Each structure stands twice: as structure tokens, then as C-alpha cells.
Amino acid sequence: ACLVGSEMCIRDRDKERTIIHLKLNVGGKPDANTKDLAYWHYSVHNPKSVVSHFEGAVVNINASDFYSENISYVNDWGVEAQNGPQALALKTKADRIAFYNCKFRSFQDTWMTTTRDADRHYVKECWLEGAVDYFYGGGNALVEESTLYNVRSGSVIVAPCHESVKYGYVFRNCVIDGNEQAADGKLKLGRPWHNSPKAVYINTLVKIPLAPEGWTNMGTIPALFAEYNSMDMNGKALDLSCRKTEYETGGKEKRKGECRATITSNEAALYTYENIIKSKDGWDPRSMMEQLPAPAHIRWEQDGLKWDAVPGALGYVLDVNGKIVDITSDTQSLWKSDMKGVVLFCLLYTSPSPRDMRRSR
């Protein structure tokens, strides 16, 4: 982790090996009718539990300007139990939060986003996993080129609660997938939690069957629950003619309302990175995701290891068999060793953002 100015960055090389995880949930105190008591041992509401002091998520991000790369965020209760109650892996409560090549895993309520309409989240090339409302909350969230992985029959992906947001939850060029249980044709794209939520899926590759209606009821009438250019595994357009357009709330004061299920190509063209993420103040998290080229002409000489300079690099970190042996701003290292192994270069550059670059023996 590093603090760059007012920005917090958490990065590593491999999200499959770098895992922030904990076993907890927010289940209430059991009563005489509670059949399964296993959850209570890991509940934050249990004063005798080791997680009683936690807020209810494995990781809570309370401040703006947060960036994470190659990290997995896992709630072990959700993943292991494959059951409720609510078990967050992540809760993000601020503006300008971005993730690249990360994993988020649980079962119910995997990731709760901010409740403020003006806040922005950007997610690229990530893995979101769960079964019940596993991406929920508010704010403008653009999720691109990511996998939404469902783990049970009747999974529901999103449950937004926007008040008067402009874009809401936007999924562009994403993949919807799941295990065998989730592939039974009962999967839903989402349901409206509170207020006037919005969720749009654009250019989605759907690998497992969706329920024909696509969406389901919850606590309010959505402002917009829609798709554009949803495709099956063969690239064939999905039939959206049976998608849900009429909604009904539950509770004592039931309400009915309508919401269209598709948007036009002209409308879809407005759901861009520039409009959703950059337009307000020029925030550009993609710049932190850019790859520098690998160091070239790596060679051993009498006075150490040398390589050609990489334009834009501020420095170089040498990692040998998992151990950092040198950090330098030069294009050579005085490190010498007869130890055989993999030399891993990690570049430090102007964002600044470390990158795994080149291995040499």
C-alpha cells in the first residue's frame, strides 16, 4: 500500500495470492425459531464473537481517492457457507474509488457502494461473485469488462437505491456467468431496493440463461432498469421482448409503476467513461491502470545487472524469488548473487503505479 498525495493505492502482483479475507456476517441474535445457529459465531452483533468490533464488512473504504489493483476481497462466511445472512466483502462510502483486476467474493451483499448520488466508482477487468444483491447501494458506478459470477439458483445481481442519480449502475462489455446451480434459467439482473434506482447493461455477454423477465420486484419502482445489445455465448442477440416493464412494491402501501427495459443505440452511446467518470472534475483512474513496456536488453555485467531505461519510469524494484533485493532509480543494480532464480522487475512510474514487468534468470 502507498499514500500518494491524498490518494491511497493498494496494489500487488497476483489477486489469486493476495487476498484480504475474514469470516463475518451481520446476522441478528437467534431466537427460538432459529434453526441454524452456525452464523451467530461469526456475527458482528454477537458480543462474544472475535468480529464483534467490525462494522459488518471485511474492508470499509470511508475516504475518497482510493485505488486498488490485483487484490482479492473475500468474505469467508459467504464463500464457505454459500448462504446468508448478509456478509459484505467490501463497503465503499466515498467518491473517486477505482479497482483494476480485483476479485470480490461472498454470497449475500458482496459489495455495498456509496449511498451518495454524486459519488463515482470505476471498476475494470474485475470479478464480482455472489448470489443475493451482491452489488448494491448508490452512486454512479461504471463497471467495464468484468465478470459477474452467480453461485446459486435464482441469483440476483444488483439492488440499487439511487435517489436522483444521472447514470446509476452501468455495466459495459461485461460477462454474466455462474456455476451449475445458477444456470437454471432463474437468474435476475437486479431488483429495485429504494428510491428511484437505475441500472443499465450494455454489450453484455450472457453465458448462462437469464430468466425471461430479466428483473424482479423489491421495495420501489425503478427509474430505469434496461439493457442494450445483450448477447449469448455465440454473439447472437438475446430476445428482450419478455423483459419486465411493470413493477409492484411490497409492504402495506403497495405501489405499481412502469419502467422500460431497453435503451436505444443513441442512448447507449452516452454511457461513456468520459461522461460518467471524468466529466465532473477530470478524474481519470484509467491512467493508473496503464502498462509501461518491459525493461529491454537485460544483461549481467561485471559490475552488476543492467537494463535499458524505460520512458516514464521513476525507478525499478528488483524481486528475486519473492524477496526485494534492490530499489533504484538507475538502470543498473549493484546486487550480486550466485543464487539462481527469477528476477522480477517492478517499475515505479509517474502515477505512481508499480507494475510487474520482466522476468530474467
Q: Where is each model-derived feature located?
A:
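Single conserved hydrophobic/aromatic residue that forms the stacking wall/gate
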Residues: 1-5, 349-360
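Sequence-level preference for short, compositionally simple segments enriched
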Residues: 6-351
